Amino acid sequence: MLGILFYAYGAPQSIDDVPAYFEHIIGRTPPAPMMGNITQQFKDLQTADPITLYAPRIAEALETVLNQDGANTVRVYNAYKHTAPFTDDAIQAARADGCTELLTLTVNPIYSASGGGSFHEEVAEKVTDMPVIPLKNYYEAASIVEMYARRVKAAYDFLPREATKKVLYTVHSQIVDPERNAPYVAAFEAFAKLVSEKAGVPDFEAVYRSGRKGWLDPDVKEAIRRDTAAGFDGFVTCELLSIVPDMESFFEIGRDCKAVCEELQVAFVQSEFIGDSFDGMMALANEIKQLHYAKI
């Protein structure tokens, strides 16, 4: 039986869990003002945490699709870095259910050693008594590119027809370290190019969010200001690091970019996240099947 471990950053089940969640992230108790701001951001979502909502539904959808032919049993387990169930919990559950091989999958189409990428290595190190198959850099797959391109084109077309348009693709910035950054930046830029070519978008750029001084740039909001000065008056943002929004991406490429565009009096549309959409789940299931060949 194949067990798929589906990894995401964390999934607080209640607003009451947020302090412990961030204590786990930063390794200490956050200062009260910082924790107050973080908690307020979660309240501003006006929904439960997006990862908390999407990740279990994605697991359920993949398990349903992959078991449709009835040839072999597939189980999908959620695993998180900073909340339960943790990686060890997911591995234990897979063992208890009798899985004989594991496949690791993250919310990140782009492999990042400092992000979801470490999950693949962690599972491979901890599980030595059965095969572990990592699904990395799945952004390269035609079906994945197609579903992103469909969303980018819909957002692009929704801008005013006469606008001079540009698509700004985003991922989380990193501290500048050329050797460490190189594969991340190369994958990001390649993904942006593939999606733009499929969507028929002539003007696009790979930019960054959530950065600090000395991190990879340009920042997406700075890019909007620069490009507005250069004559663009319609912008689409599209996050490529994760198929589901987290709190940072939810606000930074949505609300925050919208505010900049309103200030500059230019048009703005955010490309939809993949989430647990039908085409998204079919595309991911297809890539799992391709990686696992005819065993499924």
Region annotations inferred by a language model:
Residues M1-I296:
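Active-site-proximal alpha-helix that buttresses catalytic centers in soluble enzyme cores
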